[in-house]
Amino acid sequence: MLSTSGSTGSKKFVKISYENIYENTKSIIKFLNINQNHKTITTMPPFYTYGLSIINTHLYEGASIVVTDLRAIEKNFWKLMLDEKVLSFGGVPFFFEILKKIKFDQMYLPSLKYFTQAGGALKKDLIKYFQLNTPI
């Protein structure tokens, strides 16, 4: 049993089989073209399904994971992203609301290639913000 993040309401526990985890991992790796040269950073606990999915995909391919307990609202989180040359990160809708508030579009992150989102739909204004204001 794994916990969802609760970003669409209250947390839920889901039962996921080994086969589901394996197939999900392979599918994400293929879609995002994750390989051993890839590097991501933790933004969610590994006991959430989405957080574990990010860890599984990168470990399966021998990619790197920057493990941190820093949060996106902390300047040191972004310094770590820059110093470690992180290529991607994931977040739930609330995470992306925070990014807008802390002026993510003004940050210098030359290594960042993409970010992923799960846990519910992004509001239309957030989608537009990231489409218009990020060079990714």
Predicted features by range, described:
Residues 1-26:
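Conserved AMP-binding A3 loop
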Residues 16, 29, 53-55, 100-104, ...:
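Short amphipathic alpha-helical segments
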Residues 20-21, 45-46, 94:
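Short glycine-enriched loops at secondary-structure junctions
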Residues 22-39, 47-87:
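Conserved AMP-binding/adenylation subdomain of ANL enzymes
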Residues 38, 44, 113:
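Nucleotide donor/acceptor-binding cores
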Residues 44-47, 119:
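ABC ATPase nucleotide-binding domain signature
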Residues 60-61, 68-136:
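Conserved adenylate-forming
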